[in-house]
A protein has these predicted regions:
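Short, polar/charged loop or turn motifs at beta-strand boundaries
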Residues: 1-11, 38-43, 53, 118-120
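N-terminal Sec signal peptide and the immediately downstream disordered periplasmic leader
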Residues: 1-9, 15-19, 23, 134
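Transmembrane beta-barrel architecture of outer-membrane proteins
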Residues: 9, 13, 35, 65, ...
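Extracytoplasmic beta-strand/coil segments of soluble accessory domains associated
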Residues: 15-59, 76-77
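Transmembrane beta-barrel domains of outer membrane proteins
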Residues: 17, 41, 81, 101, ...
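Membrane-embedded beta-strand positions in outer-membrane beta-barrel channels/transporters
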Residues: 37, 77, 97, 128-132, ...
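Short acidic/polar hinge/loop motifs at secondary-structure boundaries
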Residues: 55-82
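Periplasmic-side early beta-strands and strand-to-turn transitions of outer-membrane beta-barrels
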Residues: 108-110, 115-121, 128-168
Length: 168
């Protein structure tokens, strides 16, 4: 997956971009904590190895938590290797490998975005604000990229029983 696909599909995060890769499914598993997990060839998240710039993220939870914390405007491309890769990438790569190649900071820039989504019509809303800044020194020796996110979701009671299926 390349950056032009992120723009065409309006993907803001790694989890949204992965939905357009065949054989990869991103599922929202917990309405309380809001985590999503990636499934490659139907296997759960802990069976997938996540790499950032070809370096492994050593955690069985890497395929579960953090997929919403990598914005697509920091990603150059995503390489997905489906199938057993445990001989090359370790025991966490039974389902496959997702290699996130980040962009090199080449110019100072800043961006901000805000997204509002309705949940169940106009009964509840989900607000997400993202800030992204890149700083590069004049001699191009040092580059720094920062990302921040503020997320708020109002509770939503679909069944009307007084209990929220989607708490804050």
């Amino acid at each position: 997956l390349e950056a032009k696909i992120f723009a065409r599909t309006q993907s803001s995060f790694l989890s949204q971009a992965l939905k357009y890769q065949p054989g990869v499914r991103v599922e929202d598993n917990c309405q309380n904590c809001g985590f999503s997990q990636v499934r490659i060839n139907g296997l759960d998240g802990p069976y997938s190895q996540i790499l950032v710039d070809s370096r492994p993220v050593y955690s069985a939870l890497a395929g579960v938590y953090g997929l919403e914390q990598i914005p697509t405007n920091m990603i150059e491309r995503i390489e997905v290797l489906r199938g057993g890769g445990s001989a090359l990438f370790g025991s966490s790569a039974i389902a496959g490998v997702i290699n996130v190649i980040t962009k090199e900071p080449v110019a100072s820039s800043a961006s901000a975005s805000h997204e509002i989504r309705g949940i169940g019509g106009l009964n509840a809303f989900e607000n997400t604000t993202d800030l992204n800044a890149t700083y590069v020194t004049d001699n191009n020796q040092i580059g720094l990229t920062l990302f921040g996110q503020l997320h708020h979701r109002s509770p939503y009671d679909h069944t009307g029983d007084g209990y929220s299926e989607m708490p804050k």
